[in-house]
Amino acid sequence: MTDAASLADRVREGDLRLHELEAHADADTAAEARRLLVESQSGASLDAVGNYGFPAEAAESAIENMVGSIQVPMGVAGPVSVDGGSVAGEKYLPLATTEGALLASVNRGCSVINSAGGATARVLKSGMTRAPVFRVADVAEAEALVSWTRDNFAALKEAAEETTNHGELLDVTPYVVGNSVYLRFRYDTKDAMGMNMATIATEAVCGVVEAETAASLVALSGNLCSDKKPAAINAVEGRGRSVTADVRIPREVVEERLHTTPEAVAELNTRKNLVGSAKAASLGFNAHVANVVAAMFLATGQDEAQVVEGANAITTAEVQDGDLYVSVSIASLEVGTVGGGTKLPTQSEGLDILGVSGGGDPAGSNADALAECIAVGSLAGELSLLSALASRHLSSAHAELGR
């Protein structure tokens, strides 16, 4: 077996390219060779990056040109009682973050939720989207394509589902802009986040569209999907899981545990999360849902770039018979429990903490459960931060924790 130093020398000499090393050595040796190259060129020490706790081959489907692994501290909040459509009972929530005080805040929210009897969560809509863009001659041809698509949905569905053992084409929504036609296909991808599944299936469908109509495919993705970008269509129509969590907290719990009142939290939420967000033209009508989404995404192997869509959340707060009702509705939470980063050993353990690693029974139930847990974690984070702001304790809490 070729050693790392020899491989590094061959790259320097132009005999090998950086991405070809795994063909000449095991994945760990290839990663070591790349570290040697980077260290020699940059003067940096990659000792910590190279000190990772799983075989490099376990990451081969998740990364190219691997040199090692970063390590983000992971903690747990809870346990928190969850009454979900796909999850029930007390759950510890795994969060990986470098933001001090985040875990403490979410943990406080979980404790208060438990004092109120737990949170309720439900996935209300599910579907991964891909929206190719076609070129047509004019608006008359665009109308013809839209009509053809509606009349031939069964044929499109058959073509899509021939590419997958698990996915299902749910519907297609056309959008026309001049001589551009966007067809937004929505799929049930079960326990997979499903972007790859949706892309492969949509490619097959596009072949049928081009063969049977005058339309020409310009791009498999026309940005109406819309993936990894702030987009109102995701906030309104949803993408991935649309999930809501809520809790009703007795007045005495709010006053004794959160040191504020239901009225103060409700007013703050309206003026900050609703009016303030509207004035800022924000798509996120919440305090910091992205914090919890990002931390749980990292801990469970989700696509971290899709935190963009996960921040499409609305937090509501109102007084109900003297108690405080709080909800968080996340419109486009793109999660999976199979495929992608969920296969990495550390991230798989994060899913194990929640009891949702791998495919669920029935299919899709594990990803639904993960979405519900993230929604409850977000609810805990919102409740804690809003209360800290209402009681004017935010800065003192950070100071006490040395953050």
From Swiss-Prot:
Catalysed reaction equations from the record: (R)-mevalonate + 2 NADP(+) + CoA = (3S)-3-hydroxy-3-methylglutaryl-CoA + 2 NADPH + 2 H(+)
Pfam families: HMG-CoA_red (PF00368)
Noted pH dependence of activity: Optimum pH is 7.3 for the reductive deacylation of HMG-CoA (in the presence of 3 M KCl).
EC numbers on record: 1.1.1.34
GO biological process: coenzyme A metabolic process; isoprenoid biosynthetic process; sterol biosynthetic process
Regulation: Is competitively inhibited by (R)-HMG-CoA and lovastatin (formerly called mevinolin).
Described function: Catalyzes the NADPH-dependent reductive deacylation of (S)-3-hydroxy-3-methylglutaryl-CoA (HMG-CoA) to (R)-mevalonate. Functions in the mevalonate (MVA) pathway leading to isopentenyl diphosphate (IPP), a key precursor for the biosynthesis of isoprenoid compounds such as archaeal membrane lipids. Is also able to catalyze the reduction of mevaldehyde to mevalonate and the oxidative acylation of mevaldehyde to HMG-CoA.
Family: Belongs to the HMG-CoA reductase family.
Name of protein: 3-hydroxy-3-methylglutaryl-coenzyme A reductase
Organism name: Haloferax volcanii (strain ATCC 29605 / DSM 3757 / JCM 8879 / NBRC 14742 / NCIMB 2012 / VKM B-1768 / DS2) (Halobacterium volcanii)
